[in-house]
Amino acid sequence: MITLDWEKANGLITTVVQDATTKQVLMVAYMNQESLAKTMATGETWFWSRSRKTLWHKGATSGNIQMVKTIAVDCDADTLLVTVDPAGPACHTGHISCFYRHYPEGKDLT
């Protein structure tokens, strides 16, 4: 059994959400033990809002829920990679992914 490192980030685990089909990274959020348990129980993503200090069910208001396909754990057991089948855009701006901007703007780093 894998033991997750909840202590490193004060009870939170960084969670990368990826589209199971396209492999596009959709968003990064945080889970606590309760949100991970709800995710496992419902098959839909739940996160911990650091700003509101509350659980949130992705898509509860927008309808853009994320159905979980797999959950992988990184080598340090402090980050999760959750692959999902999204019902719509992941970003609150309406973009498919929260990673729709590039830095620096309009420039390649190569």
Swiss-Prot record:
Binding annotation for Mg(2+): D74, D76, D78
Q: Which domain of life is it from?
A: Bacteria
Q: Does the keyword Magnesium apply?
A: yes
Q: What is its EC number?
A: 3.5.4.19
Keywords for the protein's UniProt record, in alphabetical order: Amino-acid biosynthesis, Cytoplasm, Histidine biosynthesis, Hydrolase, Magnesium, Metal-binding, Zinc
> What metabolic or biological pathway is this protein involved in?
Amino-acid biosynthesis; L-histidine biosynthesis; L-histidine from 5-phospho-alpha-D-ribose 1-diphosphate: step 3/9
> Which InterPro entries does its entry note?
PRA-CH, PRib_AMP_CycHydrolase_dom, PRib_AMP_CycHydrolase_sf
Q: Which GO terms describe its cellular component?
A: cytoplasm
Q: How is the cofactor bound?
A: Binds 1 Mg(2+) ion per subunit. Binds 1 zinc ion per subunit.
- Cofactor names: Mg(2+); Zn(2+)
Q: Which reactions appear under catalytic activity for this entry?
A: 1-(5-phospho-beta-D-ribosyl)-5'-AMP + H2O = 1-(5-phospho-beta-D-ribosyl)-5-[(5-phospho-beta-D-ribosylamino)methylideneamino]imidazole-4-carboxamide
| Subcellular location as annotated | Cytoplasm
> Which GO MF terms are attached to this record?
magnesium ion binding; phosphoribosyl-AMP cyclohydrolase activity; zinc ion binding
**SUPFAM superfamilies given for it?**
HisI-like
Tell me any Pfam family this protein matches: PRA-CH
Subunit composition and interactions: Homodimer.
Protein purpose: Catalyzes the hydrolysis of the adenine ring of phosphoribosyl-AMP.
Family, per entry: Belongs to the PRA-CH family.
HAMAP family documented for this protein = HisI (MF_01021)
Q: What is this protein called?
A: Phosphoribosyl-AMP cyclohydrolase
Q: Which gene encodes it?
A: hisI
